[in-house]
Regions:
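Alpha-helical packing segments of well-folded alpha/beta enzyme cores
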Residues: 55, 96, 150, 173, ...
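A contiguous active-site-proximal alpha/beta segment in oxidoreductase catalytic domains
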Residues: 160-162, 167-250
Length: 495
């Protein structure tokens, strides 16, 4: 395999895990260590620009005003939250300015300066080795190709992990994330922050309560196309002094530096297969999460895709993915579709849904339109006299922590239905680290979402429908596609 090592093919994976029967562990892991009521977690963070800086600000109780794509106004009376102890920061980039929109308000260099007490690293492996006995928990906010390697390395050392979505860059990585979290007894949370929102809870209650009858379909259309495919650049400009290119590449195959791969340099790593899975990998975690929760989905039976011919280097600008899920107890089989690009799915094209709706659940008695912060029963006339049931799903533990008048007044007015959820989701993880309380998006639950997203990408790249044997982690109808379930790792970066 030239210079690459295939560390986790299916046979070795199943062998290391003791066979397939023990893989589906759904319970949330309990904290491996007990904490005094006022004791601070010792937190390390890997990936501290962009969303990483925002994750840190919440966990450390920092009074900052930025968020990628949004600005928040800090209330004058804002209390410091639990204010965890930030002991180590790791990023491959320490520039103090950035050229792309997502990172321009919080480049890594500024985050390093914001926490001067934290020890600084550029290689997460060295950080975990040198500070093993000084770190309790790790926050991972890197490009997608590093999510699982860092999270797994931390969990194997007994560290609690909060990882941004999607959490895995291959099907096998998604399975392994849930398995190792359960084996090590650590608290985990995938960064699908909207799971903590009141709106998602109301949608789950409506669907499980039979508001639209038996749900047979869910269609997701986040609108917006990806970037048109392109070839790998031939130019090899010098690596910026502030960028550690080898550490940026991490486990993925070597390629010379070019700014198109680095968001901090004005590029977009998400569109390159070696670093991400495009729109599906970027946003699928948020959108699939609601369907998995409400409909009790786990593993699809099959997946097929439609789109332009697969490009070997870059992800597609348009893509349609169709998953078939089996019946679950009394719940009927479900078709789940994902579409990104300018052409809407048929159900959106045939109905005059409001522009805010990115998802629709179709049941035997009607439809339910959804977004992060609202829902609507459809057709409106049929449900004009519908009265929603009283809330029955308790608020997120973390959301309860943040329910203080100062926060509610400042953030709920600015980001209806979202501001508090973002805080609550992270505080839920903090509570789990300290007390062993459950997290809603622990890797036992969210690992199946990671697998499903990556299986869709594999089906597209394989160019054929995949019939999926989840218990044995294999494609049954197209054996050649099994090579796409894992990825090669460079020596020294394997899992």
């Amino acid at each position: 395999m030239s210079k690459l090592t295939q560390n986790w093919n299916r046979r070795r994976f199943l062998g290391a895990m003791g066979g397939a029967a023990g893989l589906l562990i759904l319970k949330d892991a309990r904290s491996a260590r007990s904490y005094q009521a006022n004791e601070k977690l010792r937190v390390a963070a890997v990936g501290i620009g962009g969303m990483g800086a925002w994750n840190l600000a919440h966990i450390a109780g920092e009074n900052v005003e930025f968020l990628p794509t949004r600005m928040l106004i800090k209330p004058a009376t804002q209390p410091v939250m639990t204010g965890e102890n930030i002991v180590a920061l790791c990023d491959v980039d320490d520039r103090t300015t950035a050229t792309s929109a997502p990172d321009r308000r919080n480049p890594p260099g500024e985050t390093f300066a914001r926490y001067p007490q934290a020890k600084r690293y550029f290689d997460y492996r060295r950080m975990l080795e040198e500070m093993d006995d000084q770190i309790d928990a790790v926050v991972v906010s890197t490009p997608d190709h590093l999510h699982a390697p860092i999270s797994l390395a931390a969990m194997r050392r007994g560290k609690h992990v909060y990882c941004e979505k999607p959490g895995a860059h291959s099907v096998m990585e998604g399975r392994l994330m849930g398995q190792v979290a359960a084996e090590k007894g650590v608290a985990t949370q995938l960064g699908t922050q909207i799971h903590a929102s009141e709106n998602y809870r109301r949608v789950v209650e409506l669907l499980r309560g039979g508001a639209i009858g038996a749900v047979e379909e869910c269609h997701i259309w986040p609108r917006g196309a990806g970037i048109a495919p392109s070839e790998r650049p031939k130019e090899t400009p010098p690596v910026p002094a502030a960028l550690h290119w080898e550490q940026f590449l991490g486990p993925t195959r070597y390629r010379p530096y070019h700014p198109v791969y680095s968001r901090g340099c004005g590029g977009n790593w998400q569109r390159w297969w070696d670093f991400g899975n495009g729109n599906l990998g970027n946003m699928g975690g948020h959108f699939f999460n609601l369907a998995f929760w409400a409909l009790e989905l786990r593993h699809p039976l099959s997946v097929e895709t439609e789109g332009p011919p697969p490009h070997p280097e870059t992800t597609p600008a348009q893509l349609h993915v169709r998953y078939k899920f089996p019946a679950r107890g009394s719940l009927p089989p479900v078709t789940l579709t994902w579409t990104h690009g300018s052409e809407p799915p048929r159900i959106f094209a045939e109905n005059k849904f409001p522009d805010w709706a990115w998802g629709v659940f179709r049941g035997t008695e009607g439809m339910l339109l959804v977004n992060y912060d609202r829902w609507m029963l459809w057709p409106e006339r049929k449900f004009a006299k519908f009265v929603a049931p009283a809330p029955s799903i308790p608020p997120s533990i973390g959301l309860e922590i943040t329910r203080r008048a100062e926060w509610i007044a400042a953030y709920r007015a600015l980001l209806p239905g979202q501001g508090l959820a973002e805080f609550g989701h992270r505080m839920e993880w903090i509570a789990a680290c300290k007390t062993g309380s459950p997290t809603a998006c622990n890797f036992g639950y969210s690992g199946a979402i990671m697998e499903t997203i990556n299986l869709g990408a594999a089906a597209y790249r394989a160019g054929t429908r995949l019939d999926w044997d989840a218990a044995n982690l294999r494609v049954t109808n197209a054996p050649q596609a099994n090579a796409l379930l894992s990825r090669p790792y460079r020596p020294g970066w394997g899992m």
